[in-house]
């Protein structure tokens, strides 16, 4: 990966391909009233944030007190929660997306056209046959450049199995979860490879598709202003993706590109 890489927003005319041209849309969804309220409230001092110690609370059937907002955990970590709706989407489509988009900057830009700049995987497994969608991203690292709020960030996101943080398959099945995307996060410029942040996107089936309950757990001392930035960013990219993922999935799966 070139540390002096040049990046830009959007997909330029000569960068489009057969996948990205039909689905790239610069326009992004407005924030919902619930998300605006969560941002305006600011740091929730009336409750504690979720971290790995109480992550299994997500397995409870009811919603938790904090589904949209941010709070400090007992150990000082900053915990950020966002819930998004995915109508007509299956958990299998979301697993497919994480294995499919990881190989290409242009595919990554479909997700949040006004914030995503660059993506490169540690391993390009797109031509490896016999892999499941989950095997295409679990164990892999995605190096991404993106705006989070006004901050231009260069991140390393390393995906791992949910069982590594206590979310075993049987428990997830019993709680009606179809998949959980888990990763550790750090700076792609950190040559030591230190990754102290965590992200969890828990995808639960609903009668109309599924819902994603996202949690970001960031180290003690993380500035509180990252709370509103990440709520805005995550809600926008996930809601934008939910708007076209079923069509993209069908297009890629059923079109003969030979």
How would you label these PLM feature ranges?
Residues 4-7, 174-235:
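Beta-strand/loop substructures that line and gate deep hydrophobic ligand-binding cavities in soluble
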Residues 23, 27-30, 47-50:
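Charged, glycine/proline-rich intrinsically disordered loops and linkers
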Residues 65-72, 83, 162-169, 200-204:
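Short amphipathic beta-strand and strand-loop transition segments with alternating hydrophobic
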Residues 37, 218-258:
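A conserved amphipathic terminal alpha-helix motif
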Residues 116-192:
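Glycine-rich portal/gate segments that line the openings of hydrophobic small-molecule binding cavities
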Residues 1-26:
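Intrinsically disordered, low-structural-confidence terminal and linker regions
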Residues 2, 18, 38-132:
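Hydrophobic ligand-binding cavity/cleft-lining segments
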């Amino acid at each position: 990966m070139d540390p002096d890489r040049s990046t830009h927003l959007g997909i330029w005319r000569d960068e489009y391909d057969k996948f990205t041209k039909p689905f790239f849309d610069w326009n992004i969804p407005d924030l919902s009233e619930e998300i605006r309220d969560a941002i305006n409230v600011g740091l929730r001092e009336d409750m504690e944030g979720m971290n790995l110690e109480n992550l299994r609370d997500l397995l409870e059937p009811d919603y938790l007190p904090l589904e949209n907002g941010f709070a400090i955990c007992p150990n000082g970590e900053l915990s950020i929660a966002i819930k998004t709706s995915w109508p007509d989407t299956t958990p299998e489509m979301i697993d497919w997306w994480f294995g499919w988009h990881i190989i290409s900057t242009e595919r990554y830009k479909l997700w949040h056209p006004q914030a995503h700049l660059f993506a490169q995987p540690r391993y390009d497994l797109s031509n490896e046959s016999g892999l499941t969608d989950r095997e295409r991203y679990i164990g892999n690292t995605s190096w991404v450049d993106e705006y989070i709020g006004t901050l231009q960030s260069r991140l390393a996101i390393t995906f791992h199995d949910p069982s590594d943080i206590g979310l075993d398959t049987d428990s997830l099945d019993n709680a009606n979860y179809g998949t959980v995307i888990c990763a550790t996060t750090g700076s792609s410029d950190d040559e030591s490879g230190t990754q102290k942040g965590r992200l969890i996107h828990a995808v639960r089936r609903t009668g109309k598709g599924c819902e994603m309950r996202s949690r970001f757990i960031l180290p003690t001392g993380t500035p509180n202003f990252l709370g509103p930035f990440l709520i805005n960013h995550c809600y926008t990219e996930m809601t934008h993706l939910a708007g076209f993922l079923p069509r993209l999935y069908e297009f890629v799966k059923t079109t003969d590109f030979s």
